[in-house]
A protein has these predicted regions:
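Residue-level detector of anion-binding/catalytic polar loops
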Residues: 3, 30-31
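Conserved binding-pocket/active-site segment within a compact domain
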Residues: 20
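Flexible glycine-/small-residue-enriched beta->alpha junction loops
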Residues: 27
Length: 72
């Protein structure tokens, strides 16, 4: 299959959505743009992808590899 690239930006990544993100991370052909907490003090469950890494993530995905580190 063709790769699917996901760049998350959500206020609930480390809440109830963590389960869904985890399921996607182990699926074949699904690749994540590296992401991390954007404001741990004010929004402890919030994560956002490093949008400057989209092109590099696509290059890796086309080679069937997940860019590392995926968690920032």
């Amino acid at each position: 299959g063709r790769p699917v690239i996901i760049a998350i930006s959500t206020n609930d990544a480390l809440g109830i959505n963590l389960q869904n993100i985890g399921k996607l991370m182990v699926m074949k052909h699904i690749y994540f743009v590296p992401f991390g907490q954007d404001d741990a003090a004010k929004k402890p469950n919030s994560c956002v992808a490093d949008m400057t890494k989209i092109a590099e993530t696509v290059e890796y995905a086309l080679a069937k590899e997940q860019i590392q580190p995926v968690l920032l």
